[in-house]
Amino acid sequence: MNKKYFYLLFTLFITIAVQAQKPTLFMGATAHLGNGTKIENAAISMFNGKIDMVADATRIRIDPSAFDTIYRVHGKHLYPAFIVPNTTLGITEIDAVRASNDYQETGSINPNVRTLIAYNTDSKIAKTVRSNGVFIAQVTPRGGTISGQSSVMHLAGWNWEDAALR
């Protein structure tokens, strides 16, 4: 049951923060940073879909008028999104079905292969992985001496242009 509430809060956290015109502030949560540190009673600000501030709320002064919305999330834990490196996520669906495998070309030297344009934003697997906290993937081709060019993609996007991380 706690897992369900965590995913609901996390989805709300991302959805609301992306739509705001001014920064959105989340107060009081325990922030787990990517380097392993933990900040109790954190103040987390998001603007245009990106985290622009993570600080200890007891050590900074916050102007409430600078934020569009302030959420009090005391007792909750917030984690950064995960990044999966060196994967075929989005360029393969079912390994047993050759037609759904876009990760390998014939021949051993294929520097022209670009996973950027082969990425499938409608992948069912990517949606499942995204619901577990993975939001960015390095999609990499396989096979051969020179396999091609990898791409770093957002798992949320309408097409490959939207999904490309630039």
Where are these regions (language model features)?
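Short N-terminal segments immediately surrounding and downstream of signal-peptide cleavage
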Residues: 22-38
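Active-site loop-helix segments enriched in His/Asp/Glu that coordinate
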Residues: 130-166
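Short, solvent-exposed loop/turn and secondary-structure capping segments
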Residues: 37, 56-57, 82, 92-97, ...
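Bacterial Sec-dependent N-terminal signal peptides
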Residues: 1-23
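Stable alpha-helical elements in mature extracytoplasmic
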Residues: 122-125, 130
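N-terminal post-signal-peptidase region of extra-cytosolic proteins
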Residues: 66, 119-123, 138-139
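Histidine-rich, glycine-flanked metal-binding segment
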Residues: 35-79
